């Protein structure tokens, strides 16, 4: 991992979106291959306690820190956010979210080219231990349904 550029985290938007100082301006970054429950959705019904937990964890871990970005595939999404794996102190924070059960391994837009095995294993362990979303039967059902859908949409790419 090249540490050529480190970016300062200016603001944590929610569990899987942060804003950083990127080449002199504020840019939002959507963390790749993770999807934490909503905490900041305009439709309040979408916001759930586990989303708040994920957002608070990201806040505690990343706010004010310098992070590395690693891109894979497209650099921006349709909302103009950068798409990247975020590393803090050399650790893949996307992997950490999956390890802690704060996010499933999010494959709606394809699998990770580089971290597929690690992400799968982290999710398997988190599920086995009933961590985070996997400790809530309703959320588990929801994510298992979504994951089978994602599997189909990823194949259709």
Describe these PLM feature segments.
Residues 1-157:
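Small beta-barrel nucleic-acid-binding modules, primarily SNase/OB-fold domains
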